[in-house]
């Protein structure tokens, strides 16, 4: 977790931006997953790694939100 915080600080990711991303995932996670699946199919698997990593991020954030840890999801 510390390395993620250091990386966020180094790259200049503001907590406001992170909160907006978490809110977007909270509201539209299913749409994000469907879009990533469609993009993988259309690209004949070329976007498979990107799709898998995006799905992992979405599932991790949704897991934090489901456990009422929205602030921790923003930090992550």
UniProtKB/Swiss-Prot annotation:
- Where is the Cyclopeptide (Leu-Trp) crosslink found in the sequence? 7-76
Offer one example of a GO biological process linked to this entry.
Answer: killing of cells of another organism
Q: Which GO terms describe its cellular component?
A: extracellular region
The record's principal subcellular location, in a coarse class, is secreted
Q: Which residues form the propeptide?
A: 1-6
Q: What's in the keyword line of the UniProt record? A: Antibiotic, Antimicrobial, Bacteriocin, Secreted
Its biological function?
Cyclopeptide antibiotic with bacteriolytic activity against most streptococci (except S.rattus and S.mutans), Listeria spp., enterococci and staphylococci.
Task: Fetch the NCBIfam families from UniProt.
Answer: circ_ocin_uber (TIGR03651)
Q: Which family does it belong to?
A: Belongs to the bacteriocin class V family.
Protein name in UniProt: Bacteriocin uberolysin
What's the gene?
ublA
